[in-house]
Amino acid sequence: MDIISLGWSSLLVVFTFSLSLVVWGRNGF
């Protein structure tokens, strides 16, 4: 596993996590 694919996967994880936080915030848990 090289640096580029590792960076893309971590970026995707952070994006998904922040997106889920925004959805949770709008729903008010």
Swiss-Prot record:
The chain crosses the membrane at residues 3-23. GO terms for biological process: cytochrome complex assembly; photosynthesis. GO terms for molecular function: electron transporter, transferring electrons within cytochrome b6/f complex of photosystem II activity. It comes from the Eukaryota. It is found in: Plastid, Chloroplast thylakoid membrane. Pfam families: PetN. It is a single-pass membrane protein. Keywords: Chloroplast, Electron transport, Membrane, Photosynthesis, Plastid, Thylakoid, Transmembrane, Transmembrane helix, Transport. One of its GO terms (cellular component) is cytochrome b6f complex. NCBIfam families: PRK14747.1. Component of the cytochrome b6-f complex, which mediates electron transfer between photosystem II (PSII) and photosystem I (PSI), cyclic electron flow around PSI, and state transitions. Belongs to the PetN family. HAMAP family: Cytb6_f_PetN. The 4 large subunits of the cytochrome b6-f complex are cytochrome b6, subunit IV (17 kDa polypeptide, PetD), cytochrome f and the Rieske protein, while the 4 small subunits are PetG, PetL, PetM and PetN. The complex functions as a dimer. This is Cytochrome b6-f complex subunit 8. It comes from Rhodomonas salina (Cryptomonas salina).
